[in-house]
């Protein structure tokens, strides 16, 4: 089976709580390989582009404000069915509905500060990787 890539963001709440190692460890134990990793604070324009699909929604401003509020870790993981595999590890967007054992189920409480982002499709992954790591693809 061919390798697929996905973008994972450990959001500012995950970084400030010291959970980067937990996220990376779970991805690696699942069998995914890290091909890029960077600690950075996002520029607002990058955040607005990343969350562009939500621009007309009432929570857009809060979402952007949060993601630029502190450093995050952006990483690219690779492996068979990487998008699907990482989404399973991450859990449902609403942490209260996320399964125990998932990152959000174990470590997050609020939908707005839900620890981690993962690409939701191979097409989104390509777009997001191009935004965060231009030249990697």
Swiss-Prot record:
SMART domains: NDK. ATP binds at residues 11, 59, 87, 93, 104, 114. The keyword Nucleotide-binding applies. It comes from the Bacteria. GO terms for molecular function: ATP binding; metal ion binding; nucleoside diphosphate kinase activity. Its EC number is 2.7.4.6. One of its GO terms (cellular component) is cytoplasm. PANTHER family: NUCLEOSIDE DIPHOSPHATE KINASE. Belongs to the NDK family. Homotetramer. This is Nucleoside diphosphate kinase. It comes from Frankia alni (strain DSM 45986 / CECT 9034 / ACN14a). The gene is ndk.
């Amino acid at each position: 089976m061919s390798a697929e890539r996905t973008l994972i963001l450990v959001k500012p709440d995950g970084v400030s709580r010291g959970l980067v190692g937990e996220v990376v460890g779970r991805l690696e134990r699942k069998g995914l390989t890290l091909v890029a990793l960077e600690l950075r604070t996002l520029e607002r324009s990058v955040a607005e582009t990343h969350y562009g699909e939500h621009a007309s929604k009432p929570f857009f401003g809060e979402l952007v404000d949060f993601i630029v509020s502190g450093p995050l870790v952006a990483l690219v993981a690779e492996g068979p069915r990487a998008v699907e595999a990482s989404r399973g590890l991450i859990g449902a967007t609403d942490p209260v509905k996320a399964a125990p054992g998932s990152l959000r189920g174990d470590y997050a409480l609020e939908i707005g500060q839900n620890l981690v982002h993962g690409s939701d499709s191979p097409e989104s992954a390509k777009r997001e990787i191009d935004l965060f790591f231009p030249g990697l693809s």
